[in-house]
């Protein structure tokens, strides 16, 4: 089967935003205008196509990234049909993992901001993730029809809060209830959409007289930004020559693709204005798969030899599995992005990460949660496979005869955990299956069992994250569970270096004995660095034979899981083995493992051990009247207020607060502010816990 749409006419984009910026509504409008959806789904009616889990419709927030495909030929049918693959990503910080995954497989993104709220905390998180993967983006300032809407203030915030270079492509005509359309700053015409047909048709009009000067000013700003794309254009511009529309567009496209500027559009998705022009901007300025650099990877040859794949059907097949979802009808759905080559349903491919072969049973293209079966997918496509057995998020799938491991995604460590048990003994096994299935879907969700108490522990990125997963277990797997009190994921480390710590394990009383003897140094590593643990072998002259060195490393590593101070994982530590002794007959791996763990425990407790606690970045929006109460409460929670910003509706307070002090904060904040304040929080870093706090935690752990 030949390719139906040339790859140059593909756009793989994500739609990303803060909660309530109107992202799902924007996606719905895109589906409507591109002709996929005949009745527009409204989030507040709980019918939006992209929000397909029951819980999402109840809570009105997007939890999983639904992927869907649409075609667009332009507002005035000025383009050949382009294929737009859209990934709708959640805006809540507890689901950052979903955003991270989708950013990894996108070529471009549309950042949706609320014209009233502007750039909010989650917007900054999403921005950092887009920077990490070098994703070119454009912005859409939504909700221009709302009270307090201010387009230019949002443009200014993109500059100051995100340290970006925003360049408006449009300015709004009117605002709040007087918002009627936009001025196209390239054509220098106003666009008015037809309300009778929900904005499908539009007319160009003259720019209203009161906007003429402002439009002129921003038009010049746009032309100057375009001219900076090349010396030739700059010379032309400085020489007073007019730049043609084609020159302006191609120059702006180049600068967007180079991540030098962010083009800003505006509108009101709810009122059917502006989304159409934003879609045109997606086609004109965001990259096709062929515009982005070749995807990097390594060969699975044990030497990590660098390799790459270009977006072409001619190259060997390679794809990245970026999401696993459980479907009630077909079991596991594996969403994947094809970077090169072609794959057909029925083909067998390799998962080089696990060195296993996988067969593509069926391939489906998703439109939110409706699926359409297809025979093949090619470079640039995003689809889902049914029938893959052992693939987890971030795995590569590739041609058997041309293996490559594509760059993996990095997932955050969980910061909160709770104990969970089924309500009935009969559900024990069902709960185990359900939790493992959920952990396979979501790499930031971990399941483990507490060795001492035998309890099952689940860990994740926040209270909401765990609530949603427990809720899904109830609905999808019909398992009722009791959930314990949230526990904080503390860590242990040392503050000082300690040298020449000895560990000796000797049992020699007739017969085969045990003998292991090690001398190690322990030193702290920089906090939050690349590695949590480093082992250095500096043994000379064979005082410990080579075959026992891994056992020493292993003995220390086993101690890291449960630290000597209070049984929490140990981080940021370097161990150096430099001396020891052995016995020809009695030495064994197990003896060296025990000796190493003894030395580690003793050394750790002498090297000024400390407890680390997770610190959260918290942002609170509150009316001014409640400022004093909110700040007073943050101080009581050991919070550190970093700064404040003005909002049309009050203030934004930015603070750092230990996670341990934030449980139940949503309820407390509601009662302090009569429900008028809102907050968001995300993990920031680990800090040393104050000694009185650490002491209480250590004693509580010992009492267990």
Swiss-Prot record:
Principal subcellular localisation of the protein: cytoplasm
Record carries keyword Iron: no
GO terms of biological process kind: ribosome disassembly
GO molecular function: GTP binding; GTPase activity; guanosine tetraphosphate binding; translation elongation factor activity
Binding site for GTP: 17-24, 88-92, 142-145
Subcellular location: Cytoplasm
Gene Ontology terms: cellular component: cytoplasm
Pfam families the UniProt entry points to: EFG_C, EFG_III, EFG_IV, GTP_EFTU, GTP_EFTU_D2
Gene3D superfamilies per record: 3.30.230.10, 3.30.70.240, Elongation Factor G (Translational Gtpase), domain 3, P-loop containing nucleotide triphosphate hydrolases, Translation factors
Family membership noted in the UniProt record: Belongs to the TRAFAC class translation factor GTPase superfamily. Classic translation factor GTPase family. EF-G/EF-2 subfamily.
Function (record text): Catalyzes the GTP-dependent ribosomal translocation step during translation elongation. During this step, the ribosome changes from the pre-translocational (PRE) to the post-translocational (POST) state as the newly formed A-site-bound peptidyl-tRNA and P-site-bound deacylated tRNA move to the P and E sites, respectively. Catalyzes the coordinated movement of the two tRNA molecules, the mRNA and conformational changes in the ribosome.
Protein known as: Elongation factor G
